[in-house]
């Protein structure tokens, strides 16, 4: 079973990622972004793997602009918080420039959630045996 971050947890990691506590400009969009990974369609998970769920969260946080500032940084942090809760962690050898370009491509609507889910594992360290798929 997957674990999901709370809105408060996301805002806490966002504060570290941004250097300030982001202001939620649109609470409805923020809540919608937070809930997207848990969506179901006809009783089945709309985003079946943890990578799909993290991609859906990252995509929503970056593209909906629910925050006054820091949407991209918060999206990246929230994505890795969700993945971390499920046993996946950012690689210690993270290519920061590649990660930045990845998030910028999401913000420019060049990547959909499916493409994001395919690419996220390249930013992760090798999977622990206890990690959720």
Per-range role (PLM):
Residues 1-133:
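FIC/Doc superfamily catalytic core
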